[in-house]
Amino acid sequence: MNVSSAFQDFQTTVNASDEQVADARERRNLFNAAFGGEQDVDKVIPSGSLARGTQKDPIHDVDTIIVFKAEEHPEWGSPGSSAEDALNHTQQRVNALLGGNGTHEAGRVRYTRWRNHAVKCWLDPTDDPDAFTVDAMPALKRNGHLLVPEAVSEKWIECDPEYLIAAVKQQHSTWNKFAGSVRMVKAWAAEQQGVKIKSLVMEVLALDLMPLGKTQPVAIKEFFVKAAALVEAGLPIDDPADLCGPIQPDLDYALFADRLRSAADDAGAAIAAQVNNNEAKAIKLWGDVFGSSFPSPPASAGTETVAAPRTVKDNPQG
């Protein structure tokens, strides 16, 4: 095993399985078909990491946005109870279309509960270890963007999820390892104990800081170096469409910066070891970065074992 084959194996680990991706797409299409024929619905938009092709294993939810016609709901979009009203309406329609007696496909949705922005819909048995939800978010189209409800503040906030979808697609078209590399740094974030890092934070950082056209190890090392410098400087990580402000206001920036700096240092040492033809040491150091899910170096750590890299497809998974 060498560094290249170790990264290929790790890519397979962080990628969601083909079966889970197919299941997620089917659920997304189910909601699209169910709401696409509704008289008060303008369109249904795929959203979230599945739509961007950056979801990692396991898939926790599938995001879909139901854009309602403003003329059918003139009271929506204003501060006050209309945010809760929109969520209640969406929940009622999900149950009517896909619940036990659903008119579109009965029994697909077992139960629902709305959260701050969306209605969370459970389709799996409660004891299914691979269960994941569909999160249906109501929205209105306004001034070229979307307005979505925020129940806690009783307000509607502006957003543009299609901006990020297009931006990620552009990066991946330039460098076909971009989406896979995003999954890797999101997997890194999920392993950090004591600090909650939203996956979207890592994705937005990668959009700005992940270099394109380099080998994957070098690109990820440079990403960690740049990300550590940015977070250490106290610069906010904002919505890339410049509409929603900070992505994670409660993020512990100091601890996040420490973790990024540690990853940058280990990644830099790994690249140096690889340059010095010590593949085993490099693999061990990348394991220090990513954790136990990264492949271990060969048992004969003092010798060089250079295997021909396998071909791994990194197809867009959205």
PLM features: residue spans?
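Terminal (often C-terminal) interaction modules
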Residues: 1-6, 239-318
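N-terminal regions immediately upstream of nucleotidyltransferase
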Residues: 1-59, 70-84, 317-318
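Catalytic cores of NTP-dependent nucleotidyl/adenyl transfer enzymes across multiple folds
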Residues: 19, 25, 98-237, 314-318
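A short, glycine/Asx- and small/polar-enriched loop/turn
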Residues: 58-62, 130-132
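Short beta-strand-to-loop capping motifs
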Residues: 66-70, 210
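Extracellular/luminal regions of secreted and cell-surface proteins that mediate adhesion/ECM remodeling
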Residues: 72, 234-236, 275
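A generic, well-ordered mixed alpha/beta core segment in the N-terminal half of proteins
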Residues: 78-99
